[in-house]
A protein has these predicted regions:
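Bacterial N-terminal signal peptides that target proteins for export
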Residues: 2-9
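C-terminal motif of bacterial Sec signal peptides marking the signal peptidase cleavage site
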Residues: 17-20
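Short S/T/G/P-rich N-terminal loop/turn motif that feeds into the first structured element of a domain
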Residues: 22-105, 109-213
């Protein structure tokens, strides 16, 4: 079964989630989201396109808006020092047909599961982190304990078909897939080279296209 989830990254002026975790992002015309995205691509290149990815489902609160979301993420960034966390993205629905309704998604990209688990354990004991969650609970609440985890790989990196968007925005589509009977992870990985070759033999220049699995 295939489920389609269309989302739009909320970055730049709205600046919902897009963040370089070790840096603060100013919300003005000098926004550096594009630089942060370039740093993310550099990190992926250093890992051969591999990442440990986690997705948290989030619910918008009664005070959710661009200004409050920006304040929330700016405050969060000041609490994060983990070098193993090299990519953070946020998604909001871009179509009424979104398979997940009005759910927001917060994506974390780590170097490894072990490093991610260690940082989550530290976060659970972080009093400042708990205070932050309480302060902004009317803006947005995310299900950290119920996060979905994946071993991810980017066969085609985001800068392959054009420079990254300086604003930090990008449009994404997600397909939720199940193994057919008798198939496994090895079969899924064996599928990737053929699909990647098909993309490379097509005209995607200037689109900024990339994909992850």
């Amino acid at each position: 079964m295939l489920l389609k989830n269309k989302s739009l990254l909320a970055g730049a002026v709205i600046a919902i989630f897009l963040a370089s975790c070790a840096k603060e992002t100013a919300v003005d015309s000098s926004d550096t989201s594009g630089d942060s995205y370039s740093e993310f691509v550099d990190s992926l290149e250093s890992t051969g396109g591999k990442a440990y990815a986690e997705f948290m489902a989030c619910t918008a609160g009664p005070d959710f808006n661009a200004e409050n979301a920006t304040k929330m993420i700016a405050a969060w960034q000041k609490l994060i020092t983990a070098e193993s966390l090299f990519g953070v993205w946020g998604y909001v629905p871009a179509a009424d047909t979104n398979a997940f309704g009005d759910t927001l998604w917060w994506e974390l990209n780590w170097n490894s599961k072990e490093e991610a688990d260690a940082e989550w354990n530290s976060w659970a004991q972080n009093e400042d982190g708990q205070a932050w969650a309480e302060e902004f609970s009317n803006v947005m609440v995310c299900d950290g304990e119920g996060r979905n985890s994946f071993d991810g790989i980017y066969p085609i990196l985001p800068n392959t078909y054009g420079a990254v968007n300086e604003s930090g925005y990008f449009y994404a589509e997600f397909y939720q897939c199940n193994y057919t009977e008798g198939s496994n992870r090895e079969n899924a990985e064996a599928f990737l080279p053929g699909f990647t070759d098909a993309v490379r033999n097509s005209n995607y220049d200037g689109t900024g296209y990339s994909y992850a699995n």
